[in-house]
């Protein structure tokens, strides 16, 4: 298979580059080993903003008496909050898939390995299939992975780790009973 532009990585840098190249009339392929949208859309920026918004609403309701509004027994449903963040990520992931099809970008699911300046092998998820493709131009946009800084100790009983299991799909509420303190993991400080 021959492309004019082959993009390795389907995160914000990769899929935008692929779409733009296709809009310019080039034959484009894109290789992504996990989910279109990368870490940002699936496990970072987008789902964390959904969780932060839930924490913001929760805090506003808890302190609504300052505005003359009384709300008694304010509570939250942790599983629904997390599910909403997953649903938003899934919807956006599907939107990127639609844009790939709309712009005639051939997508490959698997791990890319550069063989030469113009040739790439793609190891499928099943690890039994390998596809070789060539391209006049190759864009490497492989993104990021979460990591724990060596000098930073993390209390895994209180803060779930994105390294062990994705934090946005943990099966139950963390031991901290406060949604806002749990969300604090994503920002340097919480609003009061």
Language model regions located:
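Glycine-rich flavin
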Residues: 2-3, 19-26, 31-171
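Beta1/beta-strand and adjacent pyrophosphate-binding region of the FAD-binding site
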Residues: 1-11
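Hydrophobic alpha-helical segments that mediate membrane insertion or helix-helix packing
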Residues: 7, 18-21, 175, 187
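N-terminal Rossmann-fold NAD(P) dinucleotide-binding loop
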Residues: 14
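Low-acidity, Ser/Thr- and Arg-rich intrinsically disordered low-complexity segments
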Residues: 169-172, 176-182, 187-188
């Amino acid at each position: 298979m021959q492309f004019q532009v082959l993009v390795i990585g389907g995160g914000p840098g990769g899929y935008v580059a692929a779409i733009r190249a296709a809009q310019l009339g080039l034959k484009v392929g894109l290789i992504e080993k996990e989910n279109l949208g990368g870490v940002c859309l699936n496990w970072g920026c987008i789902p964390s903003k959904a969780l932060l918004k839930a924490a913001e609403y929760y805090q506003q309701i808890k302190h609504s008496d300052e505005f003359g509004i009384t709300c008694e027994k304010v509570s939250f449903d942790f599983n629904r909050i997390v599910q909403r963040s997953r649903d938003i990520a899934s919807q956006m992931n599907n939107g990127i898939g639609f844009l790939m099809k709309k712009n005639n970008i051939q997508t490959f699911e698997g791990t890319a390995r550069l063989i030469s300046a113009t040739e790439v092998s793609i190891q499928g998820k099943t690890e039994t299939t390998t596809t070789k493709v060539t391209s006049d131009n190759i864009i490497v946009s492989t993104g990021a992975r979460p990591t724990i800084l060596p000098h930073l100790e993390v209390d895994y009983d209180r803060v779930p780790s994105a390294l062990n299991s994705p934090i946005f799909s943990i099966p139950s509420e963390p031991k901290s009973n406060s949604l806002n303190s749990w969300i604090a993991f994503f920002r340097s400080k919480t609003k009061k």
